[in-house]
Amino acid sequence: MTEQQPDKEKRLGITWHDLTVKGIGKDAAFHENVASQFNIPSRVKESRAKPLLKTIVDNSHGCVKPGEMLLVLGRPGAGCTSLLKVLANRRLGYTKVTGEVWYGSMTADEAKQYRGQIVMNTEEELFFPTLTVQQTIDFATRMKVPHHLPTNLTNPEEFQKTNRDFLLRAMGIEHTGDTRVGNEFVRGVSGGERKRVSIIETMATRGSVFCWDNSTRGLDASTALEYVRCMRSMTDVLGLSSIVTLYQAGNGIYDLFDKVLVLDEGKQTFYGPMHQAKPFMEEMGFLYTDGANIADYLTSVTVPTERQVRPDMENRFPRNANELRSHYEKTQLKRTMALEYNYPNSPQAAEATKEFKEAVHLEKHPGLPAGSPLTVSFYTQVKSAIIRQYQLLWSDKATFLIPQCLNFVQALISGSLFYNAPHDSSGLAFKSGSLFFAVLLNALLSMSEVTGSFAARPVLAKHRGFALYHPAAYCFAQIAADIPLIAMQVTLFALPVYWMTGLKPTGEAFLTYWIITISVTMCMTALFRAIGAAFSSFDAAIKVTGFLMSALIMYTGFLIPKSRMHPWLGWIFWINPLAYGYEAVLSNEFHGQLIPCVNNNLVPNGPGYNNSEFQACAGIRGAPMGASVITGDQYLQGLSYSHAHVWRNFAIVWVWWALFVILTVYFTSNWSQVSGNSGYLVVPREKANKTMHTAVDEEVGSGPDSHDSRNRSGISPIGDKQETSTDGPSKIDSQLIRNTSVFTWKGLTYTVKTPSGDRVLLDHVQGWVKPGMLGALMGSSGAGKTTLLDVLAQRKTEGIIKGSILVDGRDLPVSFQRSAGYCEQLDVHEPLATVREALEFSALLRQSRDTSVENKLKYVDTIIDLLEMHDIENTLIGTTAAGLSVEQRKRLTIGVELVSKPSILIFLDEPTSGLDGQAAFNIVRFLRKLADVGQAVLVTIHQPSASLFAQFDTLLLLAKGGKTVYFGNVGVNGATVNEYFGRNGAPCPQNTNPAEHMIDVVSGSKDWNEVWLASPEYTAMTQELDHLIRDAASKPPATLDDGHEFATPIWTQLKLVTHRNNTSLWRNTNYINNKLMLHITSGLLNGFSFWKIGNTVADLQMHLFTIFNFIFVAPGVIAQLQPLFLERRDIYEAREKKSKMYHWSAFATGLIVSELPYLVVCAVVYYMTWYYTVGFPSGSDKAGAVFFVVLMYEFIYTGIGQAIAAYTPNAIFAVLINPLIIAILVFFCGVYVPYAQIQAVWRYWLYYLDPFNYLMGSLLIFTTFDAPVHCEKEEFAVFNTPDGQTCGEYLAEYMQGLGSRTNLVNPSATRDCKVCQFRTGGDYLYTLNLKDYYYGWRDAGIVALFAISSYAKLRTKASKKAES
């Protein structure tokens, strides 16, 4: 550390005085549903109500000089996080901040340019989960290499590696370098190790003032202590100012701080030296229990159910925050501490600030602007961001490679579809379609940028707070990564398609095509990236994306020729990059070509009509009157295109690209981690009458922090002494289910494969849990605690498991996974369900099918009583920012498992992680209560206080590598464990928490696994285990297996899951509104773009393309519905599938059925905005038939979208797959290539399997079949007859044969014969293989069949079972 000091020291210090922080006062808010959002009077009334301002931090003051550490303590909701955010100069989101904050001698405004030196580590762990630990830390340390290096280091790379290795070693996670960071859905390092990665990333900023918000969450006691010791050392050596808020801080941690500041309801009740805090509280009459955590004691004094008061002070002690503050304000200590507030005006502060500025200047690259808070050069920022961009791509190989492979397959299919397109008029549609698709598909693939933008945003906002790099560096890195990737993507597509289609066979033409396609793809990627950056919510961004994509496709020039665009929307063409690209590739292809007219485009043709002098082109744009051959340039001119525009358009596309990049940089630069008040309950509008106390309670907790608030639900603090009375079993206790089974595991080994070989995560672990036993599973971070729980609960799907896991001495029953409750570390719930709904859902699905519904619901009431959740039972689960708090969510997680009446045992993984001491004690108190009435409970726990640890009966202690170091009784206040370790050379010092002591001991160099295996306790434990297994096996099983994998029949599952999804969608107004808005806007766009189509030959194409455009409502809506589907699937796979709640078919059916009512509404709004606008037949028979098909299509594309999502690992992957699937369906529907011209390899099977074929067929028949056709002047084939014959005589044979569907308008003329290609729409449809009117109803029926069958099986995995 000393080697890393710069010549000038960065000793800054921070002082604040009269600091008050206010935010919008909101403890509960109503959540609208689909119907209530239209209650305009109510909404207007609420919007006019002036929002109440709530004081979050009230008149705080303090000073942390260089080299000092301040511990900020307070219950959740006290304002600790808000205080730290404001001290870290992060004020965005707060309504009002008053008072002074000084950094050295700088004001808060002056300090803004030193953003990277005043940093905050938040409680959230925001990372790219697929990157490894080393890649994550490499990036952070690269961005903070000083320009002037220490004398002992020669280059930036050496400094970066030295810094990285030091930080990894200091946090004890150097062994995880090649492991993914992971998150709740991506497997990676353990929770404690991930928290240490977060700490290292913050330390890598090499700042001067550090604010740490609950940064020991998820760390075991030993690692937490080591981390604070490390922070203490760095603070001392480097002269840092460290401000820390912690929950469940042990006394060893507490003693490392210089000062302590206690907040309660935002009021500062104590600020002073650490050693004076406890005597100060004792002096006011609050009793301290020997061995208790002093930090918890300091925050408990305002909690009536937790504090203990000296008898002689019962009538005089301060009862609330105001009285406590008032008492503190009168003390000499307050006056002494106030002397520090002049520090900013002192010579020391001025000198320190001057040195700080010089040191930062020396660190900063000279090429950066003077006011920039960054450290390394812009080139280094971009270079490092490019490396990370490729690491991100390569770390998720499936999402990167599979779409590329599918893209190539798509190219082969496309090439085969357009294979060897003729170089005459019959090939014009082929080539135009192929060129349009080349431009379109690559643009559609770019839509994934919107999803990717929102996935990356939280990490980028965090890095901006750390001043690691300029947002422009990230944007340019993406561009640099785009170029080779897009070049590869386009090349994989262009090579097969171009040469298989038989486009112009010259190198120059191919290179032009390739360059134009790359340019358009780059431009569209930049466009969608800009859209993603511009919006704060994904729903809004995807709504705009869907509409914009429809508009751009429609106005490319392929669906609507340039000359037929209506003026009110034709301007879209001129701002459309796709239009410029399409004109360029089309002009590149047809320039200089000679195109003979053939088949239907040559009138007359066939036997006896071979003289071109008496033939003419028909239906070909740009064809001169009477000509039988057309040049490519004439064809282009007919489309209002010109070859001279190719390179002009190329330049215009790149100008658009530059504009989109500038917009992306601008919007990305404005991303930030919003501070401000959050954390309030959300009440569904339909439950308003049941929860009025929640919404209007004036006394609801005052802490709108990012943490939970002890009172924000309007409930009294849990832990009422009456509840914990042991005077006899309560009514609740008597209603709780009791376990009778013995659960054992013996010789359990779990091995996984890693790049470096097999890795043993559990090594011959054994133990048991009996009814009435509360067992603790402990160990350092990464010791295998969660892994053991996963293996015991049968949740592992990979790796090799050996050993035995038995219930009552027998193999696990079929019903084990639903008979054992498992509360995972992460609280995964349906966010739009209420607490009661979540509990009832679990009870109804997981309790035995022999239990009546009434009794199941009564048991839910029992659990709500037990967990004291009455006041929040009708509030939405939501998120921690808007919904249940961390502790309330944890209670709900436990409740969801309890209501299932687990008949074997309950597993809990880190139930107290992230909670304050009081909340943690309440959770363990509940578990103790459960064990006391006969439940078997096994809990992993990280940082138990002495009083918490004393609640457990037994302990299984693991060391690194999943090795057992102790299994047995805890003893009274840990006496048995202490005796064991004392006897083996590690006695527990007096007044030391035994839990912290033993984890500290087993984390050392001594092999405690060997000590355990040689101990008499191990021998006795093995004998007891064998006895338990034999004894249980000799008796009838205590828990009878009903033989059912699921507790309820499939019909019940279907009803309950569908009901939950219906309720969820009813409340999901964003999703429903966006879906409806997309249909309304798309319908209007389609309708007004094809306004009142006429009856010319060209209008027949317009009929076709307006219907074809209707298909393109699907991509936008699918992109919107898939993330919702994947969120639900993640909930299902993370918890509900593992606990055997219900079958996948119930999951899929529930999602499908819940969508149906909204799909009907969507069909109605699209139909009403489109059908009559384009001028389709108004007769009820045809209009009704079209509506039926439109409705069926809504069902089809929803099924397709959900099926794609069901088989893809994530939302970005799904967005990449969508265009490929939709493109294949579009290809073979008979529009791009008519049936007769589809290659035989596809024609006889894929054409008939394509639902879009029948969709297009039915809609075309009903709208176009009976329409008369009237050719415009330029649409007639005009030619002369030989030897003075009349037109009728000359064409007699032709009109009987190939021209039977054409219309000769002047049969008696002898020259200038005028032939119209078609007489009715039916003649045109005949060329599309739609030969009769009944085809319409045939195809409509087949569309309905596809709608029913378009839903696919949800992917699922089997769990691993132990090998004996």
From Swiss-Prot:
Cordycepin has antitumor, antibacterial, antifungal, antivirus, and immune regulation properties; thus, cordycepin has important value in commerce, medicine, and scientific research. GO terms for molecular function: ABC-type transporter activity; ATP binding; ATP hydrolysis activity. Keywords: ATP-binding, Cell membrane, Glycoprotein, Membrane, Nucleotide-binding, Transmembrane, Transmembrane helix, Transport. Its main location: membrane. The chain crosses the membrane at residues 435-455, 483-503, 508-528, 540-560, 567-587, 650-670, 1076-1094, 1105-1125, 1146-1166, 1185-1205, 1211-1231, 1245-1265. Induction: Expression remains unchanged during the development of fruiting bodies. Disruption phenotype: Does not affect cordycepin production but significantly increases the cellular accumulation of pentostatin. Gene3D superfamilies: P-loop containing nucleotide triphosphate hydrolases. InterPro entries: AAA+_ATPase (IPR003593), ABC2_TM (IPR013525), ABC_transporter-like_ATP-bd (IPR003439), ABC_transporter-like_CS (IPR017871), ABCG_dom (IPR043926), ABCG_PDR_1 (IPR034001), ABCG_PDR_2 (IPR034003), P-loop_NTPase (IPR027417). Glycans are attached at residues 152, 214, 610, 689, 711, 739. It is found in: Cell membrane. It comes from the Eukaryota. Pfam families: ABC2_membrane, ABC2_membrane_7, ABC_tran, PDR_CDR. One of its GO terms (cellular component) is plasma membrane. The keyword Transferase does not apply. The keyword Cytoplasm does not apply. It is a multi-pass membrane protein. Residues 42-290, 737-985 form the ABC transporter domain. Belongs to the ABC transporter superfamily. ABCG family. PDR (TC 3.A.1.205) subfamily. ABC-type transporter; part of the gene cluster that mediates the biosynthesis of cordycepin (COR) and pentostatin (PTN), two adenosine analogs with related bioactivity profiles as both mimic adenosine and can inhibit some of the processes that are adenosine dependent. Mediates the pumping of pentostatin but not of cordycepin out of fungal cells. Decreasing intracellular pentostatin releases adenosine deaminase (ADA) inhibition, allowing ADA to deaminate cordycepin into non-toxic 3'-d. Cordycepin and pentostatin biosynthesis coupling is an important point of metabolic regulation where pentostatin safeguards cordycepin from deamination by inhibiting adenosine deaminase (ADA) activity. ADA is not inhibited until cordycepin reaches self-toxic levels, at which point ADA derepression occurs allowing for detoxification of cordycepin to 3'-deoxyinosine. This is ABC-type transporter cns4.
